[in-house]
Amino acid sequence: MVRGARQPQQPRSRLAPRLTGTVEKPPRKRRSRTEFALKEIMSSGGAEDDIPQGERKTVTDFCYLLDKSKQLFNGLRDLPQYGQKQWQSYFGRTFDVYTKLWKFQQQHRQVLDNRYGLKRWQIGEIASKIGQLYYHYYLRTSETSYLNEAFSFYSAIRQRSYYSQVNKEDRPELVVKKLRYYARFIVVCLLLNKMDVVKDLVKELSDEIEDYTHRFNTEDQVEWNLVLQEVAAFIEADPVMVLNDDNTIVITSNRLAETGAPLLEQGMIVGQLSLADALIIGNCNNQVKFSELTVDMFRMLQALEREPMNLASQMNKPGMQESADKPTRRENPHKYLLYKPTFSQLYTFLAASFKELPANSVLLIYLSATGVFPTGRSDSEGPYDFGGVLTNSNRDIINGDAIHKRNQSHKEMHCLHPGDLYPFTRKPLFIIVDSSNSVAYKNFTNLFGQPLVCLLSPTAYPKALQDQSQRGSLFTLFLNNPLMAFLFVSGLSSMRRGLWEKCQEYLRKINRDIAQLLTHSRSIDQAFLQFFGDEFLRLLLTRFIFCSATMRMHKIFRETRNYPESYPQLPRDETVENPHLQKHILELASILDVRNVFFENTIDDY
């Protein structure tokens, strides 16, 4: 797993926690392992001349492949984390070497066992590295199919107990390898929504950590216990459980399915833009996270991906896929995941995405961050006078929902102001801001005439919902899983599967009608329609309108700051306050028997 820690100029932008992202240092002498193995051959088999030449060559070739694979793997951390072209050839070479290494150890297992002394944990390390390669490839390409490949390798390690003998050796560094494997496996399972497996892995990891800290006098016990706490909180972040008849929890997927986005009507005139790149930025204080991935980032990540397809393996045992088996086109928009980046780091990745954005494509920026508010009154109302959202700095971050600037004569440095995004509006830009100061981005000016839309969260929630903020934002939950968000604001914490599926079907009907409201509107800004041709953006827009309409009808959302806003503004009477949509929301509430929490005659109540 590639980390940015050794490159201070880059953020730790992937899913790598401190404990799962460490890449071992390459050996100082590249031939030392080979020389050691040959000495082992001599000591285990008698005189060197007694060893068949073929077996000597087998061990030598294995050691070469092993050293080469480690060298290439360790080189991954030196690749730039941004840009989509510089790394591909390097990944190809690394895949090729690991393919040869994996097949080689399978074909020559007996010789390697007898002459090299190959241990099962060493086979596990090779499989773990291949799993990491697939995971890296997913992060670089956003192709969810490679998550399945990573999962297959990690599962094989567990099923075949490759690390089972590690605990019998008095080598704490080997146990740490095992613990890191568990942490990486958990990340992949979380991304694949395999929560049952996650729970089993957490229990096993907890037992392993307890044994590790009991046997060795270690200084990292607190860190490993923190890993357990973080993943436990992450699992429990969803506010609503869907239950089978036997009360087992149903795992719901929130990636884009074939029938997920409302279809366009025949003859509907929309733009031909497609979402190509996305920056998902998380910088909320005190929000649940695991592996440098906050709950909000996790939810938005899945909202921008299709359901994964299995890459059919041609091997009986876990093995590598040839390049010909890889998808020839990108199914998902490319994504950068930036956890608490500094301003310079964020701008570097933003500039890289902007530079490589293809023609007729859209760049999406998702900001889940603490609000930065201006202090005092300004003589002007420019793009740097309304504050923005927090970016990281080297100093300690003040706890709380907002950072207030002390020096009134200067703007906040560690802040992404709306004006900072102006240069990137030269290309189609779709912005989502989930923050207590999201309205700062309502004051945009479209300088270059390119399509530009900003979806802005409420700046405050009713008191009854504020204590849930650590488990993720309600606004982002609506964009990721609108039915779960609807249940949550309706006071429901669980639901039977049959009713859930019935409501999902009705919600699909609501989305279709919202799409018609947008495309039939005579007063809507054309920017919305220019983005409407892309499935991901179409679904985000319909969910945004559903979210806004729901909050406007709900009895506890009574302040203006409780409602989402947008730039450009949507025509309320044709969208978020449309009587036809309001009727649908009341009908959904009736299905759930929660109609009493919504106003019946909403227009009259304003």
UniProtKB/Swiss-Prot annotation:
Residues 1-35 are annotated as: Disordered. Residues 1-212 are annotated as: Necessary to inhibit MRTFA-induced SRF transcriptional activity. It is a single-pass membrane protein. GO terms for cellular component: cytoplasm; nuclear membrane; nucleoplasm; nucleus. Its main location: membrane. It holds the Pfam family SCAI. Interacts with DIAPH1. Forms a nuclear ternary complex with MRTFA and SRF. This is Protein SCAI. It comes from Homo sapiens (Human).
